[in-house]
Amino acid sequence: MFAFSKAPAGCSTYERVTQKFQDGSNKLRAAIEMDELTKQNGTINEKLQTAELYKQARQMLKEANEFNIMDIPESKRSEVREKREKTLNLEKSAQDRLIKICNEVDPNMKRASTAADPCRAARITPRNTRATVPGDKKVSKVKQTEKAPHVCSRGDRCGAHQPPPEKKSTPLKPVNQIRTRVKENKNPIGVQQQVFSFILSCCMRRNCRRPHYLFPCMISLKMNYFKFQATLPNQLNTVNRSNLLKGVDKAIGERLLDEILDSTGVRMDDVAGCHSAKATLEEAVILPALNPNLFSGLRQPVKGILLFGPPGNGKTLLAKAVAGESKQMFFNISASSLTSKWVGDSEKTIRGLFQIARNGQPSIIFIDEIDSILCERSEKDAEVSRRMKTEFLVQFDGATSSPDDRILVIGATNRPYELDDAVLRRFPKRIMLNLPDTEARKELITNTLKKHDMMDGLSSSDIRYIASNTSGFSNSDLVALCKEAAMVPVREIHRSKLSVTDGDKIRKIRASDFDTALRTIRPSTSDRILSKLSDFSRNFGC
């Protein structure tokens, strides 16, 4: 009915996106046509084929959105953005219809003929009478005519016709005796996904020779699988893109949506030390999500957290951990995200940022190096800079903001004493991430070496010795020290043998390698910076 072609390998990103969008639309149109034909009196097999078409259409439309907008020619970006918005709506419609079809099919339906003779229900479907799915290029080899006898692939479960008695096939094992290659898993959803994948591969492939009595089991698993997918607590999947951009200029909104971090792969356990900052972030982000009604009124979590301290002590890494563990919308904002060469665009961008955060709340806005944007106001400031700071303060906590807004702003800076007083007032939690102590240094060195499988040549006493000799080192200094120590065994290899040496044959790192590395890697934080940060923490810190 419809032809689904593949884009050429050497085509541009724009052509590939357009082709995938067209293929997904055609597949969805085929699914809708088959859905209309089978909505009233369709059989279970036909409805499952319709659901499979919807699933393929969703996958094609999802692939059409996997591109970088900067790879598209500037003259075509507006067209591609419109197609992306349309694609998201079509994908959502296909998902809703897919779940509805699974809900319509009763997995516990009793069939008298199957119960009376289970072997007859295990009849193999003849290849030349296989049902043709709309959009499939393969056509049945034998045309159905009025004189030809009707052969139904559903066997005795077909209410309109009976299978011819001369057609016989060897009965297969009942479904409860078939050995499925499913690994043991304590998670029931994981087991259902594996069983569903096995049955789907047996029943829905083109050269299917499996009996159709597997379909009732597949229906039950498919319903649970799609219901589980629909209830995943991912904030980005549950909020429609058009709802996020409500009340926001489209061009500015699309640029801000590119600043959203989906997943960073960093967890709280990856950050050594910083216990007070971890506890504060857990209290402000994770606990209110568990019981929002409890954290209301006077228990309402703070809306601003300022992380300050010497450079290289995990401020940005801690924000990445929050983005990785929380299911909230996370904006990673820098100075380049808010500034513009056009007059008035910076204020519009800030207003659009907070509007998108309100539309998708609960949400988190992380501003790295916040002192470059919100430093202390003075008479020497340019007019654009003053307007941008004023707009940020108004949107953060002004007349347009609401006390019920669940928006958390996290700022990170190495120079907190340069921030404006009004900015400090909007960050009630001001936490200093100081240089790691001995225990934190031991933990960081151990984690870094274990991550790269280089702990074999070192004992716990060696780690304790290294940590005691690295006083004043920041987290980034310790990582650089580990890298330098790992290079010491490599430097011992002669240059002529370096190209043919296997990495497994290099000797293990020893404590003496860290002594060698300490001669070149020195602390990067001066006493003057530490003194100024300590004074600020004593006067304004929490």
Curated annotation (Swiss-Prot):
Residue ranges, compositional bias (Basic and acidic residues): 135-169
Q: What class of enzyme is it?
A: isomerase
Record-level Gene Ontology MF annotations:
ATP binding; ATP hydrolysis activity; microtubule severing ATPase activity
Q: Which reaction does it catalyse?
A: n ATP + n H2O + a microtubule = n ADP + n phosphate + (n+1) alpha/beta tubulin heterodimers
Q: Which residues form a coiled coil?
A: 29-66
Q: Which Pfam families match?
A: AAA, AAA_lid_3
Q: Where are the bilayer-spanning segments?
A: none
Disulfide-linked positions: none
The cellular location(s) given in this protein's UniProt record come to:
Cytoplasm, Cytoskeleton; Cytoplasm, Perinuclear region
Where, by residue number, does ATP bind? 309-316
Q: What is its EC number?
A: 5.6.1.1
What functional role does this protein have? Severs microtubules, probably in an ATP-dependent fashion.
Similarity remark:
Belongs to the AAA ATPase family. Spastin subfamily.
The annotated subunit structure for this chain is: Homohexamer. The homohexamer is stabilized by ATP-binding. The homohexamer may adopt a ring conformation through which microtubules pass prior to being severed. Interacts with microtubules.
Q: What is this protein called?
A: Probable spastin homolog spas-1
The record's gene field reads spas-1
